[in-house]
Amino acid sequence: YLLLLGTLDQPDEDYGTKAAKVLATAQKYEMETSVDMVSEEGNRYPKVVWPALKYTDYCVVNEVEGTGVTGIQLYDKDGIKEENMRKGLEKLKELGVKKWAIIHSPACGYGLNCQTGEFVKVPSFKLPKGFIKGTTGAGDAFCSGVLYAAYQRESIEKALYYGLQALLETSR
């Protein structure tokens, strides 16, 4: 968890952060890497997250984290800024994400296959009022579905659906 694990967020002379060094080492041994982070309203995203993205295969963030990392406003008081989503995903790719960049929100999941340029949007499920009992762990559940799809070598579109399904299972 970037921005949460103090030791891994510390600077590293060669890699930028200790987390980036861990990810680089994993990739050196042909392991696929993924990052998660916590949402914060600070300005540590460039210093802590950017170095890690150079060694990241799969990046799955929410709209708050996506805005913090990219500097592109992905939401406002009225909701998601749809017109900025692809730009946000492209910025994650530019920062180093190698395979999939994904941004999820209550309304939609958006994904960019960084290898092919494929952009996908998958709307959230329409559920009856009161169906969702809580949102604690929602982002973690979504991420687990995405990573399962990656492990199964599914498409990025299917990965977004897997993420939504995992989220649904933990929210009731």
Give the positions of each predicted feature.
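Ribokinase/PfkB-type carbohydrate-kinase core domain
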Residues: 1-120, 125, 154, 160, ...
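Conserved post-catalytic alpha-helical subdomain immediately downstream of the catalytic base
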Residues: 97-100, 125-172
